Structures are given as structure tokens and as C-alpha cells.
From Swiss-Prot:
Location in the cell: Host nucleus inner membrane
Membrane topology qualifier: Single-pass membrane protein
Biological role stated in the UniProt entry: Plays an essential role in virion nuclear egress, the first step of virion release from infected cell. Within the host nucleus, NEC1 interacts with the newly formed capsid through the vertexes and directs it to the inner nuclear membrane by associating with NEC2. Induces the budding of the capsid at the inner nuclear membrane as well as its envelopment into the perinuclear space.
UniProt organism field: Psittacid herpesvirus 1 (isolate Amazon parrot/-/97-0001/1997) (PsHV-1)
Top-level taxonomy: Viruses, Duplodnaviria, Heunggongvirae, Peploviricota, Herviviricetes
UniProt family annotation: Belongs to the herpesviridae NEC2 protein family.
Perinuclear space-facing ranges: 1-252
GO cellular component: host cell nuclear inner membrane; membrane
This protein's UniProt keywords: Host membrane, Host nucleus, Late protein, Membrane, Phosphoprotein, Transmembrane, Transmembrane helix
Record note on quaternary structure: Forms a heterohexameric complex with NEC1.
UniProt-recorded name of the protein: Nuclear egress protein 2
Nuclear topology ranges: 274
Transmembrane segments: 253-273
Post-translational changes noted in the entry: Phosphorylated.
Amino acid sequence: MRSDKYSQLVSVVNAGLGACGTSATLVYIRNNARVAPTGDIITLPARLDGPPIPAEYILEAMTSLLSIRTAWLRIQNTGQAVIVAGCSTQNFHHGDVTWEPPASTVTLTTAKSLWVSASAVREMKVIQRIRTAPLAAMMFMCFYRGGKNEVTVRFAFYKSDSEPNLLKISKCVYEAIDAEATRNLPKPRGFDTPPCAVLAQRMRPLGAAEGGDRETSAQTHSPAAQAQHVMQHATATKSWGALGRTLKHKKNLGWILFTCALSLAAAFVTAYIK
């Protein structure tokens, strides 16, 4: 069966969950063909007291690949485990809670769900005066045990390591997309890349996205090569910048040496003529 946008979504999300000890799976399969669902699209089990989950990354992947206006994450406390589901719409039930900034922690009782939207993430960035560009500083979710089977959900933005994290995650995503494209190459209709290109544009590091001094071509470079080119370009830019600063500081010394050499040459010519 040809890979569709939902299979691509799972590949991209799992590439970002590689360090979280969990993986996402598709929910809706009907007549061996995945269709656009109205409820949960993907689900993944979360580890209590475990590594944080990149919530904003999952939301942006759903928004880009599925072309939906607002993506939602539903965090459900089953009493035995925590299940995170990606949804295209909010199916609010009695007792559910919607995350509203600026709250950084939410406590969930048994059989209750917490809804997190992509728009709420952007609102939280505005409140905390964080750059609102997608994935400029990724929002993560951590889950901790509480009393009486309660679960505490904590939201945090990691700013200091955002650029290295983006490079690592985007490289994993690009490799997953390349591998998927290679597997589907012999098939007549090929691999549907435009949504992935949108996600790649969203995940491009800030220095490359705002520089405007180069253009990348998807027809001549693979996405993995683009990520490597970005890192090489950043290193070269820093090296040339350091060289320029060194030459600027030594400009006056160069003029002094040039003047001395000219004086010595004039004295030598005068002595030779005499």
C-alpha cells in the first residue's frame, strides 16, 4: 500500500521521539486504507518520571503534514498509564480540562483528559516573551506521579539548547523522510513531499531561516544533505568572521610596517645613487 500522509506523520513524529523511550502509532485503519479521522489520529504512551516529550514538535508536525488549522494533544490519565493522542479537533468530554496559559503545571485525576492546542503554545510564548516562531524554543511536557493515582503535567520551554536540538531532530526527520522516499521510489506515484517540505521549512534553524543569503533546492539536494550544508555554512561563516576581525585589528600595524619599508627603500635608493 502506498504511503499516505498519516504514515508520513508517524515516521516524522517517531524520528523526534527517538530519545524519549516511546513511539507513536496510527489509530484509524479502515478497509486497509487510512482515512482522515475526526478523533484521535496517533497515540503514544508517556513514561511517568521519564524524559520530556516534545509537544510543540508533534503539534507542528500535525499542522504541517495534515494541513489543519489547529492541532490538539489529548493527555489522558487512565489510572495505570498516561496516553498522549494527537487530534485534529477537540472532542471535549465532561470533566476534561483545557490547558490555558500561563499555567505551567496541571494535575489530572483518574479518567480525566487534558487538551493542549498549538495556539495555546504560541500564547504561552507571548506571555513568557519567547520568540513565537515555530520551534524557535520547543515546548516539552513532563509527567510525574501524584497521590491517589493523580498525574502532574509540567510544561517547559528549553531555549538554551533549542538550536542544537533542532539540528539533531531535523537531521533524524530528514533521514526518515529520505528512507521512506527510497522505499517508495519504484511505485508510480512516488512520495508525496510537499507537506514534508513545509515541515522542513518550519524546522530550519533560525540563523538559516532569517539569513536570506542562500536558497536551497529540493531537486538538487536531499534533505539530509541540506541539514549538513547548514551546519557547514555556519562553521564557515564563523571562521571568516574571526579572520575579518583579526585583519581589522591589525590594519594600523600593517600601515606602519608598510611606511617603514617604504622609508628603508628610499634610503637604499638614495645611498645607491650617491
